[in-house]
């Protein structure tokens, strides 16, 4: 008996341990079975949670992913909280068994996308909280099973759009929080059937306008502070770059609680408070067609591209009207692009006529006519001499529906066509094409390439041989979009005539033309170098001539100045010459004697320095006429004076060389006598001797000789 009780006790402990996970708090009192595992440092969902749990709290942990088995068979769970974890992945159908779940909190995690089957099976979910994640994508069918939602919070994410079609089906939705995202457009009519909506928050997005939805028309109070009364509808749209034109006039006419919103455009209203702008300033600009195709001629079966561009405020929508007066949309042979271009892939004779381009916006509309001419190809005559033409049938480019963007089928056809022709390389002026199509058309003569630019609708044709695999298109405009098609020209075996067939088309844009550095061409470089070298030579010659002229002028001025000085000195010296002067000098005069010796040596210079030597010698002679010589100079001086007396008896008309010889001999005698006397003179005593007399030189003869020397010097300088 005791053993049985012991076993029952162990079984009870084991059951209790299995029901409540470790570290968690379990409230097992019926009917509120709750498992509280918040802030327990869990890395994953505990596997031993009681499947009868009604409320499960796993917030503030470190759970990284949700598996299919984590919440399997928990059909009684009503409230699931997974907030503030690190969840980045949720396995598809992970919540499929939670058919009674009312609230799911996944806020403050690391989710980046919501897949199609993530919330499958949550048909009774009322509150879905996904704020403060990193969501960038929500699949189009992600909310298909949560149509009973009453509150959807997608705030503080990175969403540019959400599946608006799924939102339209949430008829029970009363709170939608989309604030602090990057949503730039809300389709018109999205909230038309959401009659229970009481709060819409689109604060801090990229919305430039809000559609005039009936939901907003019912609004009585626009709340930007977030405080609303139960009976009112609150719209919060502050922090958006509103474009204040006539499209927001309906919003301006509604009541409001504050005036915090401002306009971001147009420029005249930038920065102004939305509610303070008068209604008459909410203006729109009517459309104006700025560029369109005037006329186009194409061969039957070729591709025709009609262009139409317009501007206005707001941006006008462009649609086309066929010659039959019907609205054109995407079909098997026609494509209407968002930029206003109409592309007829294969033309027929019935397409000839006037197509109408219509640009419209809330301010009005503008129209332009484009004439399309289809050149008919000849066909084979049958036996009854009637022309046999294939029946093109009704024109399938005319429909009664409004034109829109490209359908998936048309995108596939375009992609298939573009795969046949590839732009291998495109520059600002050229494009290299490669052909990938198979040449299965018999009798091909050649290929025809036709293209036209965005700014020039005139077709340009090029013919290439059928064996070509590449083709280089030249002379293109920079930064221009081109539509290029390749047609096969072949011999039709049935009609025995030449026919054409479109092989493929492609659209490409050339690069922008930037200023680039190029090397100078060799011809231009050679001519430039010759001009530069010639200029340097001419400049050098001019500088050399100028230097010579300046030097000659300076030398000429100096020569005239020195001649005058020499003549004056000699005239003064000869005029005031002292004959037979003998004076005894003290020892201190020896320095003057040495200076006199150096001046005597200076007089031996060449004829180029005669002017300077004459000036020096004359100045020294004039200075020594009034000074006495030392005794050591007596013997040499007396001998030189005797020689001068002998030569002085000759007439003054002797040749010039004799006068020069006398001067040189006199200087030589002075140097020799000075050298001998300085060598024999004792250092501490000065002997006195008889004084010597200088030789007399006739003033007129000496002046004549000096003038002749100066003239000869000037002649040599000129040479």
From Swiss-Prot:
It comes from the Eukaryota. The chain crosses the membrane at residues 530-550. InterPro entries: FN3_sf (IPR036116), Ig-like_dom (IPR007110), Ig-like_dom_sf (IPR036179), Ig-like_fold (IPR013783), Ig_I-set (IPR013098), Ig_sub (IPR003599), Ig_sub2 (IPR003598), Leu-rich_rpt (IPR001611). Residues 240-286 form the LRRCT domain. Residues 18-51 form the LRRNT domain. Residues 18-529 are extracellular. LRR repeats lie at residues 52-73, 76-97, 100-121, 124-145, 148-169, 172-193, 196-217. Residues 287-373 form the Ig-like domain. Disulfide bonds join 308-357. Glycans are attached at residues 73, 330, 339, 382, 406, 452. GO terms for cellular component: cell surface; GABA-ergic synapse; glutamatergic synapse; postsynaptic density membrane. GO terms for biological process: negative regulation of inflammatory response; negative regulation of macrophage activation; regulation of presynapse assembly; synaptic membrane adhesion. Can form heteromeric complexes with LRFN1, LRFN2, LRFN3 and LFRN4. Able to form homomeric complexes across cell junctions, between adjacent cells. Does not interact with DLG1, DLG2, DLG3 and DLG4. Belongs to the LRFN family. Cell adhesion molecule that mediates homophilic cell-cell adhesion in a Ca(2+)-independent manner. Promotes neurite outgrowth in hippocampal neurons. This is Leucine-rich repeat and fibronectin type-III domain-containing protein 5. The lineage of its organism: Eukaryota, Metazoa, Chordata, Craniata, Vertebrata. The gene is LRFN5.
């Amino acid at each position: 008996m005791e053993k049985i009780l012991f076993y029952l006790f162990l079984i009870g402990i084991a059951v209790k341990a299995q029901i409540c996970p470790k570290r968690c708090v379990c409230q097992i009192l019926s009917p509120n079975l709750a498992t509280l595992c918040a802030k327990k440092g869990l890395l994953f969902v505990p596997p031993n949670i009681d499947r009868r749990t009604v409320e499960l709290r796993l917030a503030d942990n470190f759970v990284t992913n949700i598996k299919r088995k984590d919440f399997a068979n928990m059909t009684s769970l009503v409230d699931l909280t997974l907030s503030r974890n690190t969840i980045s992945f949720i396995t598809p159908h992970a919540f499929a068994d939670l058919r009674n779940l009312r609230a799911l909190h996944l806020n403050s995690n690391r989710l980046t996308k919501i897949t199609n089957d993530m919330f499958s099976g949550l048909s009774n979910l009322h509150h879905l909280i996904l704020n403060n994640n990193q969501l960038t994508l929500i699949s189009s069918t992600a909310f298909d099973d949560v149509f009973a939602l009453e509150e959807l919070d997608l705030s503080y994410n990175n969403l540019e759009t959400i599946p608006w079609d799924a939102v339209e089906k949430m008829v029970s939705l009363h709170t939608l929080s989309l604030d602090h995202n990057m949503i730039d457009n809300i389709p018109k009519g999205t909230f038309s059937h959401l009659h229970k909506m009481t709060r819409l928050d689109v604060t801090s997005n990229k919305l430039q306008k809000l559609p005039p939805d009936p939901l907003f028309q019912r609004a009585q109070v626009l709340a930007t502070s977030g405080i609303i009364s139960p009976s009112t509808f609150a719209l919060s749209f502050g922090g958006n770059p509103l474009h204040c034109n006539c499209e927001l006039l309906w919003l301006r006419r509604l009541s409001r609680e504050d005036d915090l919103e401002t306009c971001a455009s147009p420029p005249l209203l930038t920065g102004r408070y939305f509610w303070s702008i008068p209604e008459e300033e909410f203006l729109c600009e009517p459309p104006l067609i700025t560029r369109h195709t005037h006329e186009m001629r194409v061969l039957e079966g070729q591709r025709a591209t009609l262009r139409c561009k317009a501007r206005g405020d707001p941006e006008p929508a462009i649609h086309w009207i066929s010659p039959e007066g019907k609205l054109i949309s995407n079909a098997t042979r026609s494509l209407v692009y968002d930029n206003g271009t109409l592309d007829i892939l294969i033309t027929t004779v019935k397409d000839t006529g006037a197509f109408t381009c219509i640009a419209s916006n809330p301010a009005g509309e503008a129209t332009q006519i484009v004439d399309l001419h289809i050149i008919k190809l000849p066909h084979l005559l049958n036996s009854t001499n009637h022309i046999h033409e294939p029946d093109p049938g009704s024109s399938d480019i005319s429909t009664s529906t409004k034109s829109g963007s490209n359908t998936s089928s048309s995108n596939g056809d375009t992609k298939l066509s573009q795969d046949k022709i590839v732009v291998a390389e495109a520059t600002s002026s050229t494009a290299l094409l490669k052909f990938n199509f198979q040449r299965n058309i018999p009798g091909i003569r050649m290929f025809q390439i036709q293209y036209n630019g965005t700014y020039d609708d005139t077709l340009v044709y090029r013919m290439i041989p059928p064996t070509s695999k590449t083709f280089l298109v030249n002379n293109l405009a920079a930064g221009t979009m081109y539509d290029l098609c390749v047609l096969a020209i072949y011999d039709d075996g049935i009609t025995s005539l030449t026919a054409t067939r479109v092989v493929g088309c492609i659209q490409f844009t050339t690069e922008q033309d930037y200023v680039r550095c190029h090397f100078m061409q060799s011809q231009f470089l050679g001519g430039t170098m010759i001009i530069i070298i010639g200029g340097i030579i001419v400049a050098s010659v001019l500088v050399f001539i100028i230097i010579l002229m300046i030097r000659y002028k300076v030398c000429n001025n100096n020569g005239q100045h020195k001649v005058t000085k020499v003549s004056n000195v000699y005239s003064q010296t000869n005029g005031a010459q002292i004959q037979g002067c003998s004076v005894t000098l003290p020892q201190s005069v020896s320095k003057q004697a040495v200076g006199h010796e150096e001046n005597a040596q200076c007089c031996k210079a060449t004829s180029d320095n005669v002017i300077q030597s004459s000036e020096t010698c004359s100045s020294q002679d004039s200075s020594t006429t009034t000074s006495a010589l030392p005794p050591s100079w007596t013997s040499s001086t007396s001998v030189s004076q005797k020689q001068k007396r002998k030569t002085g008896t000759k007439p003054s008309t002797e040749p010039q060389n004799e006068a020069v010889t006398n001067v040189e001999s006199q200087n030589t005698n002075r140097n020799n006598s000075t050298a001998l006397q300085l060598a024999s003179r004792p250092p501490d005593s000065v002997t006195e001797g008889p004084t010597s007399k200088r030789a007399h030189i006739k003033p007129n003869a000496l002046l004549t000789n000096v003038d002749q020397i100066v003239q000869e010097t000037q002649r040599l300088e000129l040479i």
